[in-house]
């Protein structure tokens, strides 16, 4: 398995060092659900600004305040404890008067707004996240500036970030031990973290190997191409290569790599052969995903940060602003800019 810090850089390894998250305020995440509350229904959507609190802790506190079971409070995604984050929580409170959530008090948290909603907010049910990231102690401003311009034009690898694999790669190591032992794992959280880490590592490896090719973004026979901004994809035929390549160049289509698991991987012919070869040695992890009936899926190989802008406060400090679709990692953008120091593996996105 390719170590995370050895994954291929799209723009070459950064020349500059820098500090990520010197303070929680240096990493601001604003959740974008992509829809507004209905204004009616048995659920209440609550938008919360938090600093120094993890999502589950706040959700449990909200449940206690509302005198409901913790499972009746849901959210679309985990957000980092060591950052300033805005996100929505959803509480099921049917047949009751609208609770006065302005009275909900928790250190580090502030209720910004709340409204009735018809449906439960489910994990992953968000459009994306808006990020404001401040990088400090940059050693080579010109290198970072050049890279920012390149990222605006060519994007970054859509890697799963280091935080997916746990501190010191603990989640991936757990998956490997599980895969090799075959023993049952009954802890639901461990199962989820370990399976996710296994699939993410296999995806990252495919992308890293493909990026080593000079024509990595050249469509090949059997590639599964994703419609930009959507989850649907189709398999390209030899007759469609030229037209599809033009659409990839225009960012209308995205080349994908497999998230391995049970069932059809989605790609065919030359593309499938490449993916199989890229992770051929990782038989234990592949077998684990099949055994645990994790369904195979696809994910775009490249990521194009939207609304990307930056402002140099001085020669060693830059503020970045960009929007990413759900499931993408801000740290994968930062990785292409600087060799980071600071809190990296603990950032939940």
From Swiss-Prot:
Taxonomic path: Bacteria, Pseudomonadati, Pseudomonadota, Gammaproteobacteria, Enterobacterales
NCBIfam families in the record: PRK00984.1-4 (NF002155), tRNA_TruD_broad (TIGR00094)
InterPro entries assigned: PsdUridine_synth_cat_dom_sf (IPR020103), PsdUridine_synth_TruD (IPR001656), PsdUridine_synth_TruD_CS (IPR020119), PsdUridine_synth_TruD_insert (IPR011760), TruD_catalytic (IPR042214), TruD_insert_sf (IPR043165), TruD_pseudoU_synthase (IPR050170)
Domain TRUD: 155-303
EC number(s) from the headed UniProt entry: 5.4.99.27
Reactions listed under catalytic activity: uridine(13) in tRNA = pseudouridine(13) in tRNA
One GO CC term, this protein: cytosol
Superkingdom of source: Bacteria
Function: Responsible for synthesis of pseudouridine from uracil-13 in transfer RNAs.
The family this protein is said to belong to: Belongs to the pseudouridine synthase TruD family.
UniProt entry tagged with the keyword Transit peptide: no
GO molecular function, one term: tRNA pseudouridine(13) synthase activity
Native source organism of the sequence: Klebsiella pneumoniae subsp. pneumoniae (strain ATCC 700721 / MGH 78578)
Keyword list, A-Z: Isomerase, tRNA processing
Enzyme class: isomerase
Catalytic site positions: 80
Keyword tRNA processing found: yes
Classification via CDD domains: PseudoU_synth_EcTruD (cd02575)
Binding site for substrate: 27, 129, 329
Protein's UniProt name: tRNA pseudouridine synthase D
Pfam (any one): TruD
GO biological process: one example: tRNA pseudouridine synthesis
């Amino acid at each position: 398995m390719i170590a995370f810090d050895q994954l291929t850089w799209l723009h070459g390894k950064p020349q500059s060092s820098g500090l990520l998250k010197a303070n929680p305020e240096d990493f601001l995440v604003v959740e974008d659900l992509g829809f507004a509350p209905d204004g009616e229904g048995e659920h209440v959507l609550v938008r919360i600004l938090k600093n120094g609190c993890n999502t589950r802790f706040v959700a449990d506190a909200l449940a206690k305040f509302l005198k409901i079971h913790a499972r009746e409070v849901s959210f679309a995604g985990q957000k980092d404890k060591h950052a300033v984050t805005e996100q929505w929580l959803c509480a099921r409170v049917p047949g009751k008067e609208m609770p006065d959530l302005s009275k909900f008090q928790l250190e580090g948290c502030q209720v910004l707004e709340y409204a009735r909603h018809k449906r439960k907010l489910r994990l992953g049910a968000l459009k994306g996240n808006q990020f404001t990231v401040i990088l400090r102690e940059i050693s080579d401003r010109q290198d970072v500036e050049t890279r920012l311009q390149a990222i605006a034009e060519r994007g970054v690898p859509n890697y799963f970030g280091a935080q997916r694999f746990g501190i010191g790669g603990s989640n991936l190591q757990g998956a490997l031990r599980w895969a090799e032992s075959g023993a049952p794992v009954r802890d639901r959280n461990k199962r989820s973290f370990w399976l996710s880490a296994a699939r993410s590592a296999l995806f990252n490896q495919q992308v890293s190997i493909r990026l080593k090719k000079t024509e990595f973004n050249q469509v090949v026979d059997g590639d599964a191409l994703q419609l930009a901004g959507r989850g649907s994809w189709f398999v390209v035929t030899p007759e469609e290569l030229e037209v599809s390549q033009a659409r990839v160049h225009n960012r209308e289509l995205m080349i994908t790599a497999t998230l391995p698991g049970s069932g059809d991987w989605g790609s065919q012919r030359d593309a499938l052969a490449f993916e199989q070869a890229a992770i051929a040695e990782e038989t234990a992890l592949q077998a684990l995903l099949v055994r645990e009936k994790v369904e195979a899926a696809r994910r775009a190989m490249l990521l194009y940060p939207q609304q990307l802008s930056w402002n140099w406060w001085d020669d060693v400090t830059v503020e970045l602003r960009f929007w990413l679709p759900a499931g993408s990692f801000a740290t994968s953008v930062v990785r292409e800019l600087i060799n980071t120091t600071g809190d990296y593996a603990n950032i939940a996105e």
